[in-house]
Amino acid sequence: MALKATALFAMLGLSFVLSPSIEANVDPHFDKFMESGIRHVYMLFENKSVESSEQFYSFMRTTYKNDPCSSDFECIERGAEMAQSYARIMNIKLETE
């Protein structure tokens, strides 16, 4: 009986060791792109809501996916530009206006 339990634990341990590790798909350039858009434009939206946040995120994600940036500097610049474009396209009033 002890031999069965030992074999079972050994098999379980081996399956954990041999199973592929799960990695999060993290793109640091996308993070810079989004942070820049949020900091420079989204925070100035007069009316913020869950719906407006989701729409903004969807626009930014799609824009980035279609034409990703390749350096932190480029991502910061383009993130702010795309967020400004979104505000213009959607006729969103900013606090500075």
From Swiss-Prot:
Signal peptide from the UniProt entry: 1-24
Main localization, broad class: host cell
Disulfide bond entries: C69-C75
Record carries keyword Disulfide bond: yes
Protein name as catalogued: Antiholin
Pfam name, any one: Antiholin
Membership in a protein family: Belongs to the T4likevirus antiholin family.
Post-translational modification: Disulfide bond is required for functionality.
Any Gene Ontology CC annotation: host cell plasma membrane
Highest rank taxon of the organism: Viruses
Function statement: Involved in lysis inhibition. Senses superinfections and inhibits the holin, thereby delaying the host cell lysis timing. The genomic DNA from the superinfecting phage bound to the complex holin-antiholin probably serves as a signal for the lysis inhibition and blocks the holin multimerization.
Gene Ontology molecular function: any one: molecular function inhibitor activity
GO biological process: killing of cells of another organism
Complex formation: Homotetramer; in free-form. Homomultimer. Heterotetramer composed of 2 holin and 2 antiholin. The holin-antiholin complex binds dsDNA. Interacts (via C-terminus) with holin (via C-terminus); this interaction blocks the holin homomultimerization and delays the host cell lysis.
InterPro entries: RI_T4 (IPR034696)
Compartments it resides in: Host periplasm
Swiss-Prot/TrEMBL keywords: Cytolysis, Disulfide bond, DNA-binding, Host cell lysis by virus, Host periplasm, Signal, Viral release from host cell
